[in-house]
Curated annotation (Swiss-Prot):
Catalytic activity: D-mannitol(out) + N(pros)-phospho-L-histidyl-[protein] = D-mannitol 1-phosphate(in) + L-histidyl-[protein]
Native organism taxonomy: Bacteria, Bacillati, Bacillota, Bacilli, Bacillales
Subcellular location: Cell membrane
Subunit structure: Homodimer.
The protein's name in its UniProt record: PTS system mannitol-specific EIICB component
Annotated active site: C396 (phosphocysteine intermediate)
Organism: Bacillus subtilis (strain 168)
Record GO terms (molecular function): kinase activity; protein-N(PI)-phosphohistidine-mannitol phosphotransferase system transmembrane transporter activity
Main location: membrane
Residue numbers of Phosphocysteine PTMs: C396
GO BP terms in the entry: phosphoenolpyruvate-dependent sugar phosphotransferase system
């Protein structure tokens, strides 16, 4: 039984890591995607301010700029700047060799280029004569990049192009058959498993951008980014919740709906797993509404805020987008209200959701208890003091949303305690080696430990409302 739990936990971490890697190629470049979306929404013939000259920016940006940024980032994740350069060079082969924006090809060639130049450098390590290092470094990168570019142009490009067209055709069939709402059955539970960024930016966005380049918008940008389901759940807690969940729900609703940080409502579902049904019902009804009104966005809305959604909505499409968000929120609220009111069990506090969170994510409560005991011992054994702690890092999947909120809260507490300690946030994949304390959500701690085993790791159930912040401050003040 214990071995099975460990295997399940290991599989969960692997899935999260793979998903994080996919989204990691897109997330750092979201600003460029939004820039393209703004230019598209404003200056194409059907835009707000049609401009024939500025419209010429749209095609080169989506054909060359965005795929090359993705490829560079993918290569850099494997082998820093050198890997990024070779990855971007290799990607030009699939880009030039196709007649559609080659995002999928860039997501393949970028990491492949980074990996191959990394292996090539290992092959020549300690074998280069003194004084020839720069020559060998430059030419190995050039030769590997050129070879991969030619291979991508003639062999990999056509395969990826066929795969791209099959995926696009499959999505078209699903949309026209009005089956897209069924996607919520998979998307909403996956979001609570911290795969939201992987789904949105790793899978849906690349296909959505290709659709948007042809039709001016894509409904795929609304599949994961819709804040309606989460808003409905948080509103239900405002009216029918108990204890700290009721008191914290209003603030969480504001941050979720206007700030676009969806992770903030995950603990509320994990306290009462039946609420996943509310999220699915809200998501499905929202997608059905989007489909009926032929709604879509011109580019990815990141974060999933109502403000970002409105900014990426094409001219004349506001009613459909708003209707989908409001319907999703209303349905989610009604289902959540029924579940919360009919629940006989007493409402759990936010900090008491540990065991149910583990059961939702593939681990038994015994494993959770063992993990907590192990963490408690580790924290007690390590003598934390201002002298031994210089940097505290909050880490989450993307390093932009929930971890940023947690870092802000602890930073204020550190300032009030007059401690000279840096508190920042980052993605788990980018954890710096000099971090003394790493704070993560409980379900991401295993990944953080694997990335930075020598740091002190603290797990929390909710970045916004954890008693461990005050406990940490007290330990640091001693």
């Amino acid at each position: 039984m214990q071995q099975q739990e460990q295997q399940q936990g290991g599989m969960k971490v692997k899935v999260q890591r793979f998903g994080s890697y996919l989204s990691g190629m897109i997330m750092p470049n979201i600003g460029a995607f939004i820039a393209w979306g703004i230019i598209t929404a404003l200056f194409i013939p059907a835009g707000w301010f049609p401009n024939e000259q500025l419209n010429t920016l749209v095609s080169p940006m989506i054909t060359y700029l965005l795929p090359l940024l993705i490829a560079y980032t993918g290569g850099k994740m494997i082998y820093d700047h050198r890997g990024g350069v070779v990855g971007a060079t290799a990607a030009i082969g699939v880009i030039v060799g196709s007649d559609i924006p080659m995002f999928l090809g860039a997501m393949i060639m970028g990491p492949l280029g980074g990996y191959l130049i990394k292996q090539t450098d290992k092959l020549f390590k300690d074998k280069v004569k003194q004084g020839f290092e720069m020559l060998i470094n430059n030419f190995t990168a050039g030769i590997v990049g050129a070879a991969l570019t030619i291979l991508a142009f003639y062999a990999i490009g056509p395969v990826v192009l066929t795969l791209n067209k099959l995926l696009a055709a499959g999505v078209e069939v699903i949309v026209h058959a009005n089956l897209l709402p069924v996607a919520s059955v998979f998307v909403e539970p996956a979001k609570v498993l911290f795969l939201n960024n992987a789904i949105n930016h790793g899978i849906l966005s690349p296909i959505g951008i290709e659709q948007a380049s042809q039709t001016g918008k894509s409904i795929l940008f609304l599949v994961e980014a819709n804040p309606g389901p989460g808003l409905g759940i948080l509103l239900a807690y405002m009216f029918f919740g108990k204890g700290s969940s009721k008191s914290t729900a209003p603030g969480a609703a504001i941050i979720h709906f206007f700030g676009g940080i969806h992770e903030i409502y995950f603990p509320y579902i994990l306290m009462k797993p039946a609420l996943i049904l509310a999220a699915i019902a809200g998501g499905a009804s929202g997608l059905l509404t989007f489909t009926i009104f032929n709604a879509g966005l011109v580019a990815a809305a990141s974060p999933g805020s109502i403000i970002a959604l409105m900014a990426m909505t094409p001219r004349g499409g506001y009613f459909g987008v708003l209707a989908g968000v409001l319907v999703a929120a209303a349905v989610s609220f009604i289902v959540s209200a029924v579940i919360l009111k009919s629940s006989k069990a007493s409402e759990e506090d936010l900090a008491a959701a540990t065991e149910k969170m583990q059961s939702m994510k593939g681990k038994k409560s015994q494993a959770a208890a063992a993990l907590e005991a192990e963490q408690a011992k580790a924290e007690e054994a390590s003598e934390l003091s201002p002298e031994s702690v210089n940097k505290i890092i909050f880490a989450c999947d993307a390093g932009m949303g929930s971890s940023a909120m947690g870092a802000s809260i602890l930073r204020n507490k550190v300032k009030k305690a007059e401690l000279d300690i840096s508190v920042t946030n980052t993605a788990i994949n980018n954890l710096p080696s000099d971090a003394d304390i790493v704070i993560t959500h409980k379900d991401l701690t295993d990944r953080a430990k694997a990335k930075l085993p020598n740091a002190t790791h603290i797990s929390v159930d909710n970045f916004l409302n954890s008693p461990k912040y005050d406990e940490l401050i007290e330990k640091l003040k001693k």
